[in-house]
Regions:
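N-terminal small-residue-enriched
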Residues: 1-142
Length: 142
C-alpha cells in the first residue's frame, strides 16, 4: 500500500506476524559479504579487544544514526591471542557511520542462518535470516 501511495515500485518489504496484525515495512537481506581475511588473521591483528559471539538483539535510530546491539558473550584478546577471560552480557553502541568507517578487516567465511527475527515494538515479530561475515571494527562496549 505505501509503494502505491508513494508512486514507487513495490519491493515486498511489507510483512506481518499474522493475518490479524498490521503490516510493517521490514528490511531485506542485510549482511556483509565475505572479505579476504581468516579469523586467525583477524584475531592476531588485535592488540586489545574482544571477539563478540551470539548477537541476539539490535536496533537503530534512523533519524540520528545511532545503533545498539547486544550479544551473549565476548572473549578478550590481548596481543593477538585469546586470554581466556569472558565478558557477558555484551552491549555495543555507537553511530552507524563511525562503525562502518572503522571496519578494517572482513572474514572470508560467511554464515547466514534463519534463526533471527525482526521486531516492531513489543508485539510484532517476524522470522528473518541473519548472519554474514565476521568484522573487525571499533565499537563502544558497556
Amino acid at each position: 500500500l505505501s509503494a502505491a501511495e508513494l508512486g514507487t515500485i513495490p519491493t515486498g518489504n511489507g510483512r506481518r506476524q499474522s493475518y490479524k496484525r498490521k503490516a510493517y515495512t521490514r528490511m531485506t537481506n542485510t549482511f556483509f559479504e565475505g572479505g579476504t581475511n581468516t579469523l586467525e588473521e583477524m584475531v592476531a591483528s588485535v592488540d586489545y579487544g574482544y571477539m563478540i559471539f551470539d548477537t541476539n538483539n539490535g536496533m537503530e535510530d534512523p533519524k540520528n544514526w545511532g545503533i545498539q546491539c547486544t550479544a551473549l558473550y565476548g572473549k578478550e584478546i590481548k596481543d593477538g591471542k585469546f586470554t581466556g577471560n569472558i565478558i557477558s552480557p555484551v552491549v555495543m553502541s555507537g553511530y552507524v557511520i563511525d562503525l562502518l568507517t572503522s571496519i578494517s578487516m572482513i572474514s572470508k567465511d560467511v554464515v547466514v542462518t534463519g534463526s533471527g527475527s525482526c521486531g516492531k515494538g513489543y508485539k510484532e515479530w517476524v522470522r528473518v535470516s541473519d548472519g554474514g561475515a565476521c568484522l573487525k571494527a571499533k565499537v563502544k562496549i558497556g
